[in-house]
Amino acid sequence: MEIYDFIYKIDSFCNYSNNWNIIQDSYTNEKYGYFADKRPIEVLIKNSIINADKPPGPTSHEVAYWIKQMFKVSKAGHGGTLDPKVTGVLPIGLENATKLMSYISSSGKEYVCLMQVHCDFNIDELKQIISKFIGIIYQKPPVRSSVKRRTRKKKIYDIEILDTDKRFILLRISSDPGTYMRKLCHDIGVILGCGAHMRELRRIRSGIFTEKNLVTLQEISEALYMWKNCKDESDLRKILLPMEYATCGMPKILIDDNAVDAISYGAMLTAPGIVAYQRFRVKDTVAILTLKGELVAIGEADVDSQKLVDMKKGIVVKPKRVLMPRDIYPRSWKKHG
């Protein structure tokens, strides 16, 4: 089926692999909704994510606002704040896709950081000091911070020295979201004994979004011009990622057309509505999709997927975030009250 090819593209986006288990044969009625990778451009815009390359200068909110104005949409949100001087990966969700930004914001980050130390140093000693910061660290946000200044526990997954030039060190750092790179550089300098500070910072990954398909504001502007003035939407389609790509790494469940509308109203997903699924465990975050690949909701698994084979009824997933607008698919349930 075409749907599995589309989901394979999504999962390949972050090298995720999870086999499918088919419970029942079903088909989707093309009268309702759209195949997620073939939405009309106007519909795609309202259900897409742009992997923007934030320039130095503006705030993350300003970049999101500019893109909102460019597309003339009612909402745009970003997936993780970058300071004005910081550049790099800034996923922007448009309209319906803004509901997914919290999942991106709470995912791991990766940076390239230029640190300057305040004295000559021995590279082996520096490597030893840096290695001590891999793992759990404790940070207090800087004085000029938008959050409450309390000590926070963060995890540094890896720090790699990419290059050195006199007192300048280029680092690649993988960490929890909300880790302060400026503070990390300062603390490394304290242990070194002579001080250090961050000179430049670029984010190269936010969750599953990397530099691989970054687009600049200029490229967005040019693609919009070609669509509006030359009726050529090809460049715009390369820029607009269907919001379903944000589910890469999540186990997925495909549901029957008759179950879609109830879920869009916030109903629990029960066993009879499931057509196919990837393996998941209790409490896992699961993506619920139509047979056209449209994201209906993201929820929490109430059972282990191994139980699905024998389940004839009962709750499987409790939706936490509904993305499918109501009444797109036909109603096959009775509304009470």
From Swiss-Prot:
Gene Ontology biological process: box H/ACA sno(s)RNA 3'-end processing; mRNA pseudouridine synthesis; rRNA pseudouridine synthesis; snRNA pseudouridine synthesis; tRNA pseudouridine synthesis
Enzyme Commission number = 5.4.99.25
Catalytic reactions of this protein: uridine(55) in tRNA = pseudouridine(55) in tRNA
Residue limits of the PUA domain? 250-324
InterPro entries in the record: Dyskerin-like (IPR012960), PsdUridine_synth_cat_dom_sf (IPR020103), PsdUridine_synth_N (IPR002501), PUA (IPR002478), PUA-like_sf (IPR015947), PUA_sf (IPR036974), tRNA_PsdUridine_synth_B_fam (IPR004802), TruB_arch (IPR026326)
UniProt keyword terms in alphabetical order: Isomerase, tRNA processing
In terms of superkingdom, the source organism counts as Archaea
Cross-referenced Pfam families: DKCLD (PF08068), PUA (PF01472), TruB_C_2 (PF16198), TruB_N (PF01509)
- In Swiss-Prot or TrEMBL terms, this protein is called Probable tRNA pseudouridine synthase B
Q: Whose protein is this, by species?
A: Sulfurisphaera tokodaii (strain DSM 16993 / JCM 10545 / NBRC 100140 / 7)
Gene behind this protein? truB
